[in-house]
Curated annotation (Swiss-Prot):
Protein role: Shows chemotactic activity for monocytes, resting T-lymphocytes, and neutrophils, but not for activated lymphocytes. Inhibits proliferation of myeloid progenitor cells in colony formation assays. This protein can bind heparin. Binds CCR1. CCL23(19-99), CCL23(22-99), CCL23(27-99), CCL23(30-99) are more potent chemoattractants than CCL23.
Organism: Homo sapiens
Database matches in InterPro entries: Chemokine_b/g/d, Chemokine_CC_CS, Chemokine_IL8-like_dom, Interleukin_8-like_sf
Post-translational modification summary for this protein: The N-terminal is proteolytically cleaved by proteases associated with inflammatory responses. The processed forms, CCL23(19-99), CCL23(22-99), CCL23(27-99) and CCL23(30-99) exhibit increase in CCR1-mediated signaling and chemotaxis assays in vitro.
Pfam families associated with the record: IL8
Sorted UniProt keywords: Chemotaxis, Cytokine, Disulfide bond, Heparin-binding, Inflammatory response, Secreted, Signal
Endpoints of the signal sequence: 1-21
Name assigned to this protein: C-C motif chemokine 23
Protein family according to the UniProt entry: Belongs to the intercrine beta (chemokine CC) family.
Taxonomic lineage of the native organism: Eukaryota, Metazoa, Chordata, Craniata, Vertebrata
Amino acid sequence: MKVSVAALSCLMLVTALGSQARVTKDAETEFMMSKLPLENPVLLDRFHATSADCCISYTPRSIPCSLLESYFETNSECSKPGVIFLTKKGRRFCANPSDKQVQVCMRMLKLDTRIKTRKN
């Protein structure tokens, strides 16, 4: 009987602490996002950069710009530079920022963002 009460108490404590940790992480993410300097923000509400977003490798495929919704560049703390694109289907992938096609897509997305901003 004592073992089951102790186990139940432990389970309740772990559950409470786990949900609190998630709330804390969400609050930290929101705080970090509010401090990011964005010159021309092209990020959407459902797609945010965090300090942990770094590219380990680049996609070997050429992705058509028309399939892309937004992007952000990785920060200088990452071991290699990168551009993280978000597709219209919600997939994320890393690309090489020195690649000509990547630069074309980045310019196109910046232009699209400026046009949408002016219309609103």
